[in-house]
Amino acid sequence: MELRLYDTATREKRPFVPLHRNNVRMYVCGPTVYDFAHIGNARPVIVFDVLFRLLRHLYGAEHVTYVRNITDVDDKINARAARDFPGLPLNEAIRNVTELTERQFHEDVDALGCLRPTIEPRATEHIAEMRDIIERLVAGGFAYVAEDHVLFSPAAMNAANKVLPRYGALANRSLDEMIAGARVDVAPYKKDATDFVLWKPSKPGEPSWPSPAGIAAEGRPGWHIECSAMSWKHLGETFDIHGGGIDLVFPHHENEVAQSCCAFHTARMANVWMHNGFLQVEGEKMSKSLGNFVTIREVLADWPGEVVRLNMLKTHYRSPIDWTLRGLEESAKAVDDWYRTAGDLREGRPADAVIEALRDDINTPLMVAVLHGLRNEAASGGVDDVARFVGSLRLLGFLAEDAAQWRARKQQASGVDAAKVEGLIAERTAARARKDFKESDRLRDELAAMGVVLKDGKGADGKPVTTWEMAR
């Protein structure tokens, strides 16, 4: 089956045909580095990591470029820097905040089993490209200067030639609908309520750079222009896939399309637009006011990254996901079982059925069902069945540790005394050898009360062997 992806722009699932088969290009909006990423931020990271892995499998790792940006210039960053480092000059405080937060983000997503993108550009390293695009937009009549701001005019875009897309087409809204449905800044320097900022003057002490379009005062970029500049620099005027959360469709992605298409006179910025659905916690929208706001780091303190990863992938990426304790517990049991079944094997080719599930618009619920079937085949089959199961899991970012490491980390997290457990198992083994099954059962119950699950089997020499792990 061919790869088919749902395109937000056309609102249909259609075959994916890369612009250049030997250079498949994908851009995904990354974090604004001012605070710990919350669990909802993990969803696009995991979803597009799976797509990245699939594209590498289909086209070859050397033929796929994945760009995910770092936004390191933003009002939220300025506010956090002033709050956390009041005794430092603002620029130095900002550097402390962005470097720390970026490092925390990388630690979190690494723990989730995500590959690093091919390129991870920072906004502040692409100011020249932003100014270049802004100059083109002003020269083309799509943007104008007012009170040291540069603003983009959607009305000018929609009045232009038919090569350009209509502003609002991605979000499937008219200009009137966008005005009515959004909190629009109607600053007096705007010609129209829908106009949005490309560049603005910096306040004293804020980060600033020489301004475009003949503006004497230094300033800084608006949010939307950053992604247009970084995607252009690293992927070109038009590329294959642009991804992000559903909340970014409007205004962020709509404005990216407007800036890029008008600057380069193209009909498309990206051939396919993909958006993941919202995340809610125990049936409610996640928010600090409800007390259910959870960071990735907080979740990882209680659950292994592979458990979090599986819990995300059990729901199709376009559907809303309900983040629940029960779901995490079920995912933990599944990952434990996968490690037991895989044993020490870490090589193998992925099953065709897994690839076919992913070819169908990254159908991860079907993929998970296939994995459970492969697990059953591996548990009762031969080494080829285990290898196919392992290869499938490895492709998807699972089995990052060997089985012994997984068990040891789980045991350590439980706080159980491993030496005591081993001693009780030895006593039970001796009781079984002398056929004292009452004592054997008593010891098993004692271990179960400690949260220890026993698995009786035979070693290579045919003698009885008992292994153990902690129950979740």
UniProtKB/Swiss-Prot annotation:
Q: What does the record give as cofactor?
A: Zn(2+)
Tell me its EC number(s), please. 6.1.1.16
- Biological process GO terms, please? cysteinyl-tRNA aminoacylation
- GO MF terms, alphabetically ordered: ATP binding; cysteine-tRNA ligase activity; zinc ion binding
Where is this gene product found? Cytoplasm
- Organism superkingdom: Bacteria
Q: What class of enzyme is it?
A: ligase
In the record, the note on similarity to other proteins reads: Belongs to the class-I aminoacyl-tRNA synthetase family.
- How would you summarize the oligomeric state and partners of this protein? Monomer.
The name of this protein is Cysteine--tRNA ligase
- Species per Swiss-Prot/TrEMBL record: Bradyrhizobium sp. (strain BTAi1 / ATCC BAA-1182)
Q: Which gene encodes it?
A: cysS
